[in-house]
């Protein structure tokens, strides 16, 4: 009972305070703040453009003879008439990579395969069988367009794909 009377006394004591007189009431009485004006200058934008990264990798320059000293070679102009196509990476290289997992499992990966990936698997097996003396172990992933071959054959497969015109 004493607590209730104390609360009532406190409520009566704060009667002169208006409820809700916070930021909302103050913002309605004042105008918008005065911001300093600005000047838009396009003359200096060339310095900003130098800092922005390029949106795409530029096309490689034309050379007198191929392969270049670095070993790069462009794809054949009419693409080869095969049921599959191996697209170049964004740096214009043949997408054949070495992969090692679990410390000693060596794999070669061909990425960016479009079309009939099973025909590519058969051609790769026909190409590598004389080198190995047996049929290589391969794994096809149709969803990601990758072909994995057990062992390191990246240099041989890159040369073979370049010879085919990819």
From Swiss-Prot:
Residues 56-78 are annotated as: Disordered. Pfam families: Img2 (PF05046). It is found in: Mitochondrion. The keyword Cell inner membrane does not apply. Its main location: mitochondrion. This is Large ribosomal subunit protein mL49. Belongs to the mitochondrion-specific ribosomal protein mL49 family. GO terms for molecular function: structural constituent of ribosome. The keyword Nucleotide-binding does not apply. One of its GO terms (biological process) is translation. Interacts with OXA1L. Coiled coil: none annotated. It comes from Macaca fascicularis. Keywords: Mitochondrion, Ribonucleoprotein, Ribosomal protein. It comes from the Eukaryota. GO terms for cellular component: mitochondrial large ribosomal subunit; mitochondrial ribosome.
């Amino acid at each position: 009972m004493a607590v209730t009377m104390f609360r009532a006394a406190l409520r009566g004591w704060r009667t002169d305070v208006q409820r809700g007189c916070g930021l909302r009431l103050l913002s309605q009485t004042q105008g918008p703040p005065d911001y300093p004006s600005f000047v838009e200058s396009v003359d200096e934008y060339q310095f900003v453009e130098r800092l922005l990264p390029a949106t795409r990798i530029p096309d490689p320059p034309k050379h007198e003879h191929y392969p270049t000293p670095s070993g790069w070679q462009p794809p054949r102009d009419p693409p080869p008439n095969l049921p599959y196509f191996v697209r170049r990476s964004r740096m214009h290289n043949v997408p054949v990579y070495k992969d090692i997992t679990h410390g000693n499992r060596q794999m070669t990966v061909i990425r960016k395969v479009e079309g009939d990936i099973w025909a590519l698997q058969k051609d790769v097996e026909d190409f590598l069988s004389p080198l190995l003396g047996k049929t290589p172990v391969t794994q096809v992933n149709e969803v990601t367009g990758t072909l994995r071959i057990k062992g390191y054959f990246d240099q041989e497969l890159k040369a073979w794909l370049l010879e085919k015109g990819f």
